[in-house]
Structures are given as structure tokens and as C-alpha cells.
Amino acid sequence: MPFLGQDWRSPGQSWVKTADGWKRFLDEKSGSFVSDLGSYCSKEVYNKENLFNSLNYDVAAKKRKKDMLNSKTKTQYFHQEKWIYVHKGSTKERHGYCTLGEAFNRLDFSTAILDSRRFNYVVRLLELIAKSQLTSLSGIAQKNFMNILEKVVLKVLEDQQNIRLIRELLQTLYTSLCTLVQRVGKSVLVGNINMWVYRMETILHWQQQLNNIQITRPAFKGLTFTDLPLCLQLNIMQRLSDGRDLVSLGQVAPDLHVLSEDRLLWKKLCQYHFSERQIRKRLILSDKGQLDWKKMYFKLARCYPRKEQYGDTLQLCRHCHILSWKGTDHPCTANNPESCSISLSPQDFINLFKF
């Protein structure tokens, strides 16, 4: 007679009916309870016991195989709909609420990184999650986070673009994980601690790959940036929104260095990112008695957040409370759905799930 304990995967215990009632029997060789039913039961009952034990073994083996496949999978958990309904409380029609991890799984960030208009948006969102929201993700969402991050790194290694941006992202994530992993026993991360240590080693490997990357020059010989007129070069440099990009560009050639030091260029950059009040609080004069806009920019960047602008963003419909990418169709009953949609910055997206 098989008896299942608390662990449904166990083979059970061996019992035999005697004149005094049911008793367990201990195998003298192995020191454990076994189903040596050949001596106590009929052959039919013995075969039933073996069949029951084999079924338990098959179920346990299938579960172990499924767990192993889940731990090794590299794909994101996709959903057919590329939108999600954001609800913050229970109602008669809908119970529960939407979490950050659920939204992260449903909004198809894995495909969004392939779009140059959405790439910076997704990277900024990953950085914000790595800073403070990693513990609020579910186990599946944390796995998707690492899988998307791996695709981002592979894309940067292939395209050789946005290298510094991803370096900063990896450094932010590694610093956060160092703090979270030290909190042993507090259940701040989902999964085994050794798995997260392995992921940290993977992050270090990615950082080393980015540090060792060699920018390959294009094979064709045509018109280059330095061949353009100076006014056109300066016009293009005014489109750069990061001062560090201007400094790096000025290190390419002496002529570009002269353009990168243009006072008007740095003045427009300061006025783009910061308000007049912020600028007046951080005035810096040069040796000639003029405003040093370059030094002012980097000082302002350390004190205030810079302006963020993206080619494509997530948007929230105020009519039906559906979150989706711009241009993605969603079931909305409004007469003019486009007028009901508002764009969300990465920080607005995070704040949307703070209850």
C-alpha cells in the first residue's frame, strides 16, 4: 500500500497488512523502507506498486527537465498583445493590479531595442530599473531583464555604437547587484544566490568586451565629416545633446577640437538642458572675464538632471488606461484615441507602478 508524504515526488513508504494491522518494513541491507512486496503481497499488488513508483519517478524527471530548460532559456516571454491595461486597484470587473514586472514582460522590449528610435528609451529604462526597481520584478521579469540586456550588449558589439551608454548601464547594474547580493537571507532577489553571482561574472565579461572593442574604419573612401564646410560641421555638432560627445569628437582631429571649444555651441547646450534660473546659480567666469559655458555645462550636469528627448516613447491612453508603444493599435472606445494618449518618459513609466 503506497503512502505519499508531504513531498508528492517521493516514492512513498512500504506497508504490509498483518494480523496486528498495517506495519512498515525496513530493508535490512539499505536501512530504508522499501517495497519488498514479493514476500508479503500477491504478484498483482507488487506490480501495481512498481507501476506507481515508476510514475512518480517519471513525473519528477519531467519536472527536473523542465526546470533545467527554463534556467537555460535565452528567449523573452512574449505575449500576443503588445499593450497592457494598467489598473492600480481591484474592482468588481477586475481583481488585482498591474505590476512593473508584468508590464516589462508584455511590452516587447526585446524587439524595441532593434529600433533606433526606441533604443535610448529602453536603455534608460533598464538603467532606472537597475538602480532601484530590480527587486520589484518577478522571477520571470528578472530573467527577461538579463536576456534583454544581453541582446543590447550584443547589438552594441556588432554595431559599435552607444558604447559609453552601455558601459554606464552595466556599471550601474553591477553596483546594485553588489549591494543586493550582500543581503543574504533577506529575499531581496528571486533565485539562488549562486545564479546571481554567475550573472555578475557575466556582466564583468561584457564590460571587458566593451573595453576591448576596436572601432573599425569603413572600407569605402568617400566624403567624411571633416570634408564638410565648417558651418555645416558646426550645425551638425549642435545636434549633439551630450557634452561628452562633443569632447570626444574634438579629440578626432585638430580642426574639430577648435570647433568643439566654440562658446556659442556650449551656450546653446546649456540653454537646451537647463533653465535660466539654474544657469544663473552656477555662473563660472574664464580668465578673460567671460562666461565659461563648457565648465558651466559639466557643473550643471552634476547638479541638475539633463533634459531627456527620445525618438519614440511609451504612451498611456487616458481614456482606457492602456499602455503601449506609440503607433501600436489598442482596443480603445474613444472617438479620437490619439488625442487621449500622453507620452511617458522612462521615469514616468516607473512612477506609474509605485503604489
UniProtKB/Swiss-Prot annotation:
The gene is FBXO32. It comes from the Eukaryota. One of its GO terms (biological process) is response to denervation involved in regulation of muscle adaptation. InterPro entries: F-box-like_dom_sf, F-box_dom, FBX25/32. GO terms for cellular component: cytoplasm; nucleus; SCF ubiquitin ligase complex. The lineage of its organism: Eukaryota, Metazoa, Chordata, Craniata, Vertebrata. A motif (Bipartite nuclear localization signal) lies at residues 280-295. It is found in: Cytoplasm; Nucleus. It holds the Pfam family F-box-like. Keywords: Cytoplasm, Nucleus, Ubl conjugation pathway. This is F-box only protein 32. The keyword NADP does not apply. Residues 223-271 form the F-box domain. Part of the SCF (SKP1-CUL1-F-box) E3 ubiquitin-protein ligase complex SCF(FBXO32) formed of CUL1, SKP1, RBX1 and FBXO32. Pathway: Protein modification; protein ubiquitination. A motif (Nuclear export signal) lies at residues 169-173. PANTHER family: F-BOX ONLY PROTEIN 32 (PTHR13123:SF6), LD30288P (PTHR13123). CDD domains: F-box_FBXO32 (cd22103). A motif (Nuclear localization signal) lies at residues 62-67. Substrate recognition component of a SCF (SKP1-CUL1-F-box protein) E3 ubiquitin-protein ligase complex which mediates the ubiquitination and subsequent proteasomal degradation of target proteins. Probably recognizes and binds to phosphorylated target proteins during skeletal muscle atrophy. Recognizes TERF1. Its main location: cytoplasm.
